[in-house]
Amino acid sequence: LPESEWQVEVRILPKGELPAEWRTNPDPWQAFLDRDSIVGQLRLRTRFTGDRFHPLGLGGGRKSLQEFMIDAKIPQCLRDKWPLLVDDEKILWVAGWHISDKAKVNPQTREVIWVRFCRSAILDGKRV
């Protein structure tokens, strides 16, 4: 994201090479996505008015991104800057929170997109 402290790392892995902890995923800043669920190109962006999201664990249901961010207790001052991983059709991952149910790794998954966000440290206004 322009003028952001966020850095992102992306790798494509065969499903058989997933790390052992991928199902429980102890790191909220990494996500494992079904490559076949991606439509078009991956992009990073912030929220748009009216965004909707299919959070994993909601039984395939849809929720407004604003409502999701409120429920997740993302501070209001950060919501317009919060990184979203999207494709041409949908929000794939609200970084640090949930992936989309539409992008989850499933039994038919052959390749996985592994994504990790990290925030650069800022010290006295300078990146370190």
Tell me the role of every PLM-derived stretch.
Residues L1-V128:
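Basic, glycine-rich polyanion-binding accessory segments appended to enzymes
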